[in-house]
Amino acid sequence: MDRSSASRPDLYLIADNDSVYEQDLLRNPGTIKPWLAYIEYKQQNGTLYEQAFVGRPLDALIISILNDFQVMERACKQLPRSYKLWKMYLEFRTKHLKNRNAIKYRAEFQKVNTLFERALILLNKMPRIWEMYLTFMLQQPLVTQTRRTFDRALRALPVTQHNRIWKLYKTFARSASGQTAVKIWARYMQIHPENAEEYINLLVEMGHYTDAIKRYMEILDNPRFQSREGKSNFQLWTEMVDLLVSKAKKIETGPQTGIDVDAILRSGIDRFADQRGKLWAGLATYWITKGNFEKARDVFEEGITTVMTVRDFTLIFDSYVEFEESIIGSLMEAAAVRADNGKADEEADFDLDLRMLRFEQLMDRRPFLVNDVLLRQNPNNVIEWEKRVALWGDNNVEIVNTYTAAIAAINPKKAVGKFSELWVNYAKFYERGGDLDTARIIFEKAVKVPFKSVNELAETWCEWAEMELRSENFDKAVEIMAKATQAPKKSTVDYFDETLSPQQRIHKSWKLWSFYVDLVESVSSIEETKKVYERIFELRIATPQTVVNYANLLEEHKYFEESFKVYERGLDLFTYPVAFELWNLYLTKAVDRKIGIERLRDLFEQALDGCPPKFARPLYLMYGNLEEERGLARHAMRIYERATRAVSDEDRFEMFEFYITKSASNFGLPSTRPIYERAIAALPDHEAKEMCLKFAEMERRLGEIDRARAIYGHASQFCDPRTNAPFWQKWEAFEVQHGNEDTFKEMLRIKRSVQAQYNTDVNFIASQAIARSQQRAPEGEEATAAAEREMDTETTDAMAALERQARAPIGFVAASTGPEGGNRAPPAGQGPVAAPANPDAIDLDDDMEAD
């Protein structure tokens, strides 16, 4: 390098104050520090020209004059390997050209380019210098030079630093566009194949659709490819298909390019089952775009006959219809033009008529095609096969073909719906046509089919017999049912054993036997009917209705004793509650038949033996009524008395009322006293209270006032005055009518005593509070809270009273003041009892004061 120029600077740029720095440079020519100090000094204290050079934007003329005389230039020439000096110098030079027009200041830009080239002679491994240079080049319209500079940078720098260059290179490719961008990206993809999506977008923007499809195929065939944009393989594949369909004419296909659109879309149809409708329509659209209408029609036909869902079918069919309508519309417009011009084209008119006919046929086929789709989904769908038969209307040939195809396709164990109905309808089809022999052949085959359930097989046998009945072949119908019910003498087959075929279990089908017995009963003799019923009992498949029907049949034919035996056999088969209904019928029939009283008594005793309490009441009433009519009244009373102990708790009160009524009617009112007494002892409190009122009223009617008063006194223990006011009102009315002052006072004393008793019963207080809260519930939550507070207060008062009673002196007995003993005084230390007029305030004030 020529160092003489660095030692001979322009003297007018050197001021007197610069001599110190110049001498320092002479003493240390190879050191960077003096140069940095000199540059910093010049930037702050240079001459007018220098300040203009180093600190302000200059026009091109001044820069051209001062370029060879600046301190930075001298420094870079003196120390050409200094990265720091070159970076400072290059930043300084590029700064003054920032936002300048590269065309207008072309010469100045070229000087800076040359300066970068000088710097890169020795600093070509510095990526920052290359970045500055390339960024500066991007401001200039020099495409070829810029591209070559990028290539030089990539060759000069190690691979680990290429990312810094490629970041700028991709920006340049976008701006350069065209073939340049494509080739740059092709090179970039060799290093970074993971950015294939960005490359594909560029190819699509540039119109290189064939290359874009190839790239799509590459990344889809690469199992290791991970989308930078988070797209799945399906999304990428869908984008490729959309591009193939939309740009069909601009994409090169065939063996030369390796792009087979038909194979690509068909592979997607096999792979993506939920997108088949869209893909079939896309493939057809591709051929339409290519102008191959016949191929498109073939694709549509294949699509609508292979898809598995109605949604996909609808999508393809609608596209197919739209395609045909567009072609017909074009042909009709052409025909209209020919008609206006007076021209005739028989071939074109024939083509239009043919397409119209094809379109009508397509629309007529739609219901059948939809049915085909549903049957492809599940060929075992009996309901859809029936719909297909209905679609054919009066086309007998196709109906037979459909039935035949359905029977061949359906697996009886997997059938959806009743497979037996299909067989039955098939036979009825021939029956309606008058071909009974063929219908019988179909039924013979049907009863051998291993249906899912015995019930289906039973329905098939019954339908066969009904067909014979419709043809008035009664003997044939009976013969068919006899054949259906054939079984070993002592069958051990379990009807619910699914491991056995329906044919092995059919002889225990109640539906089959029910039809059989009705058939025999209507067309055969009573003896034959009895044999069928007996066989039902032998197989132990009789139902309660069977027992009743058999018994009624025998009764109608005057076989009364046999009818009773049938009831008894039924009772051996069934337990309660079914047995209760059978006993009810049996006993009613026996009573109506007027058989011996002793036998009837035995039957009733047998019925009541082991009878649950909830079913006992009707039987006891029937038994008692029998004794009243044909036996002794005392026997009836004993039966009613037994009933009061045997019936359920819910029925006991009513049973006692009935017993009392019967006793009064037969033996007079006094005979009911022991019954009332036992009822009061046996019934719960709330029912005992009602019974006491009835008992007291009965005694009053007999004039036994003292007995009635005693009963009221006994019942008072069940009645809190605050919750059972009607009871006390009745007693008060009784005393007003039949009592005196002493008895009335005694009633009031008992009332206070009972209330005090309930005040100290914590359990009763709690239940009472709950009852009140339930009564006040409609008033809202505030009323409920008030009831709870009242319950707490009463409970506290009751507990305080118990404590005071425990602290009372032992052995203290109050004097008697009343006519019958009077009221007891409160224990020592306790306040006086409140007046009866305000019973709720008993001991409340004293308790509050004690607290």
UniProtKB/Swiss-Prot annotation:
Q: Which GO terms describe its cellular component?
A: post-mRNA release spliceosomal complex; Prp19 complex; U2-type catalytic step 2 spliceosome
Q: What keywords does the record list, in alphabetical order?
A: mRNA processing, mRNA splicing, Nucleus, Repeat, Spliceosome
> Which segments show compositional bias classed as Acidic residues?
842-851
> A GO biological process this protein is involved in?
generation of catalytic spliceosome for first transesterification step
Cell compartment(s), UniProt: Nucleus
SMART domains tied to this protein: HAT (SM00386)
InterPro entries, alphabetically? HAT (IPR003107), HAT_Syf1-like_N (IPR055433), HAT_Syf1_central (IPR056350), HAT_Syf1_CNRKL1_C (IPR055430), Syf1-like (IPR045075), TPR-like_helical_dom_sf (IPR011990)
| Renumbered residue ranges of the record's region Disordered | 771-793, 810-851
Intervals holding HAT repeats: 12-44, 63-95, 107-139, 141-175, 291-326, 398-432, 434-470, 487-519, 558-592, 595-629, 667-701, 703-737
Q: Where is the composition biased (Low complexity)?
A: 825-841
Q: What protein family does this chain belong to? A: Belongs to the crooked-neck family.
Its annotated function is as follows: Involved in pre-mRNA splicing and cell cycle progression.
Oligomeric state and partners?
A: Associated with the spliceosome.
PANTHER family assigned = PRE-MRNA SPLICING FACTOR (PTHR11246), PRE-MRNA-SPLICING FACTOR SYF1 (PTHR11246:SF5)
What is the name of the protein in this document? Pre-mRNA-splicing factor syf1
